Amino acid sequence: MLFSLSHGTRIVQDTAALQPVPSDGPPSPPFARGAAVLENPAEALERLDAKPISAVVEGAVASTATAATRSMAISTAPGAFRYLFRDAPGLPAGPATLAALDQLAESMAVETADPGDASIPPILTYFGQFIDHDITANTDREVPGLSEIVGDIDPMDRVQVEQGLDNLREGTLALDSLYGDSPGQGAFATKLAQLMRHPTFTDKMRLGVTADSGDGRPPLPADPAADLLRLGFLLDRGDITEAELNALDPALRENFVDADGPIRSRAIIGDGRNDENLLVAQLHVAFLRLHNRMVDLGHDFEEARRLTRFHYQWLVLNSFLPGICANDVVDEVLATGAPLYAEFLDDNPPADPAKLPMPLEFSVAGFRFGHSMVRGGYDHNRFFGTPVAGSTQILPFASFELLFAFTGGGKMRPDPSAAPGTNLPGNWVIEWDRMVNAETPRRSARRIDTHLAPPLDDMVNQASRPGTPPMMKRLAMRNLRRGYRLNMPSAQALIEAINATGLYRPIPVLTPGQVSEGRDFLVAPGLDAATPLWFYVLREAELVGGNHLGALGSHLVANTLIGLVVNDAGSYWNAKIDGHRWSPHLFQPSQPIDSLKAMLRFTGLLA
């Protein structure tokens, strides 16, 4: 279980012993405007019926994606990050390259008049982030030596990088970010994982309820289970005590306690990063509800988990990838079973077959294309977006800053001067029908291009530790410098290496002029011909219209995600029903969960 992960933070292992001491949790503090008081939530929850999803709103999932420390509770051997091609040349080293990278970051952060609307629905932006959190953790965290990206830096030796970076995820699409019960956890993480299961209906996962905002709530879901379970609820029930929190190792304790006492808004979930912004948090709620709906169909916990994983994996390969990659590349990689990843796996056999190696080129660069898809604000719901009959608009859209504020890390308050809250206010529940189509402005993702929305140049809830350099809040600069420090192959070198395998049709290479157009400063240090991989992935997508990745980006993303599923013995790909590969259509022929829309309908979140 990853308790909290915020950018530029160190890793802490949970080894503290629990010391239970009876104590009453403090009362819920009042909320500021946009939030509300949830009076006596335990009493309301105990009245819920045992059968439907609403029976599990007693909650337990812990996360604080915006805290200054990421704490990890796994004590078994971690997974591995490895280079796809260790010998592929990197960027030219030296001060001229660093200066050009910083100038490149500045150019990417400029707000343009073009709104950048894509034909991609916003849900894919945050489904991508959810996937990333499920399969990788560590490449952008505080690791001595490797995480030094400020000032004059040089590329690290690749052997040192591989030896110094551990993947704190399984490296498979197994939803350990949802269930949080990986083997070998410390005592406190083990207790939290147990609390994530409903105490009475033990096959179900707990969820939380929303607070009364005074403005009403969107009509879906029809039951109260619309939030993650949070620390305040567990404190009020006595499931966790302040004494237990105070007895934790200091680095672990700061994820749950600050100068004002317990962080009551802290979500208790398998990966704290999934509560770093509200859109990912609400998607996490959807997958918890998916598990619980499987239980409603009569499946026990393990079978419900297996079916939830299968549907998730199927959606990644058959909904997410076609939505963001060049479809001819996806078709080619699916038809051949991702041989590029298979060769990578042969070169990097894992010590634990349950933990697949992760390509650094994917994690550090290729899969960060989603940063370009982030909007500065969204048509979130009828209160923070386009109103509907009978509703009162509070704001014309939900700003990026507010979507970070109404999380555990933001303490459910519109600004730091407001009183903190515990639960998500009801008027902040997402209306998913605004996120699954790309029909109107603020109801689509931004195009995948070489510009980032202005809020990504001053990241909220990031780098909050005193003394953290300002650049840690600047996403483009952080990505470019980290890629340089971790000695990523240049994009052109990577294309040459992939093409040399002969596994696929040749990947075309952008000309130096196509790379440097409008950015002549890339020419002198040679970055037009040996280009930072992250920037190149965005640039080639930009040149094909920005509605999907280009050839290299599509290959990196499709080969990795398909390869993880194909090479996981427990995945849907390797499960058979009457001789046929498992699919949602075989599981539920009349109403298959074969799209994100179908999943949201099945979970009661979309009409």
Predicted regions, residues:
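Fold-level signature of zinc-dependent metallopeptidase catalytic domains
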Residues: 273-276, 280-289, 293-297
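Terminal regions of secretory-pathway proteins
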Residues: 1-273, 277-278, 299-607
